[in-house]
Amino acid sequence: MYNNETMMQYFEWYLPNDGFWWKRCAAKAEHLARLGISAVWLPPAYKGTSQEDVGYGVYDMYDLGEFDQKGTIRTKYGTKEEYIAAIRAFHEAGIRVFADIVLNHRMGGDELEEVKAVGDSPEDRLQQVDGKQTVRVWSKFTFPGRGGKYSRFTWDHRHFTGTDWDEDSRRTDRIYRFTGKHWAPETDPERGNFDYLMGMNVDMSNRSVKRETEKWLRWYLAQTGVDGLRLDAVKHISFPFYRELLKRLRADGYPDLPAVGEYWSGDPERLLHYLDAVDNEMSLFDVALHYNFYHASQAGADYDLSGILSHTLVSERPDKAVTFVDNHDTQYGQSLESFVADWFKPLAYALILLRQEGVPCVFYSDYYGNPAKNRPLVPNLGKMIRLRRAYAYGDQKDFFDDPHCIGWVRRGDREHPDSGLAVLLSNAGAGVKRMRMGLRFAGERFYDALGVFPEPVLIDADGWGEFRCAENSVSLWVRANAFEDLIVNE
């Protein structure tokens, strides 16, 4: 990741199925660049089980909206040509593109196969609850609409370890593990073994699968020109798989390919263990920090803000942390619903955008709002993104000395004119805190960038200033020239 990079997850779950998304992306590229976004994470671009699929019900990864399959040529987001045009528009605006890569499972098979399997418990995949039986499963993927273009590889039961659906019994209380197969030994330990997630579970130990997967990824990188990878559901895939795959890619053709993995766990020890297991070949989203935000937003004044960054990836391994407030999975109605309360979102975004540790990822619905779910945009989020790009530089000093009012200062650097700022947060009453900007700021006035407090803060001869914030809110204080610049560019 680059210094002071700001990523945006440029999609959410409830986008309309009108096929215009890639065109909308291209139209917004220049705006996002002016705002200060340096990278975007786009949704899965390949054909899913239907036109309405958000992209995680993967059917054919070679079909980027090019072939008549699953009742549609385009995906929910548009056609292959429009997708590549959107990537080109982002590149022309100076924005890097991260593609969403979903390798764990396949769905929407073309033909049924009879397969011998045993039944494992959904709650403990190491507990076998049924003996050997014959099941009929949708394990054959022949992609008739594509007709072998790009790859003649087809999938059958040999390429999967199991599924949760038998077409004959239609039971939902079993996971069918194909005989001769075993769940991958190095996955998350939740539910005994969390190799299986959904659909037809891809067998990453199969040599043919490994070869075809790497072939596809090289094809995809060459076809689209994307700059980086967002890796879905990594805790469900054998840990050595991505370690070896990323090493091979970087050794042969893609030396600077960045990757960020989604390992969904609020336990930072599991995140750290995974990073060690993959030799730090990727960054991870800081799910532990997200849950701190969520719990703080629910508890209000009962939450100790001085520990908001404790037990997180960004506090333990900041160079590998991609921080976020919410995403498409935490939205209302989704499987990992844990949406941060509206009042706390500005505080949370200040904590990821205006500090030096980690790479922040802004959620599309927080910036634009979400009419489909009647959700508002986060106030002043655009201003915080601009502040990060222009002024959030230099040494950082924390003042996390109160359970309800915390703050920090950034002391600027010579490379960024007028850089340096002060941030104060409260989860209870109005807050006041003395914070030291440093001697070089002595005599300067700092102004509230959010416009709540009209009177400036004067930095005294020893470099200290007394900063304020309103109850349950955040205040952002910048130098006089920076404040004038923000007003001009509002």
Task: Place the predicted regions along the sequence by residue.
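Glycine-rich FAD cofactor-binding loop and adjacent beta-loop-alpha segment at the N-terminus
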Residues: L64-Q69
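Active-site-adjacent substrate/metal-binding segments within catalytic domains
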Residues: T6-M8, E12-A26, V40, P44-Q51, ...
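Soluble non-cytosolic domains of exported or imported proteins
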Residues: P16-K23, Y77, E81, R207, ...
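Active-site-proximal helices and loops of the catalytic beta/alpha 8
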Residues: Y2-E5, R24-A33, Y46, S50-Y62, ...
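Long, low-complexity, polar/charged, intrinsically disordered or flexibly structured peripheral segments
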Residues: R152-S208, A222
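Substrate-binding cleft of carbohydrate-active enzyme catalytic domains
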Residues: T75-G109
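Boundary/entry segment of secreted carbohydrate-active catalytic domains
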Residues: M1-G19, Y196-N206
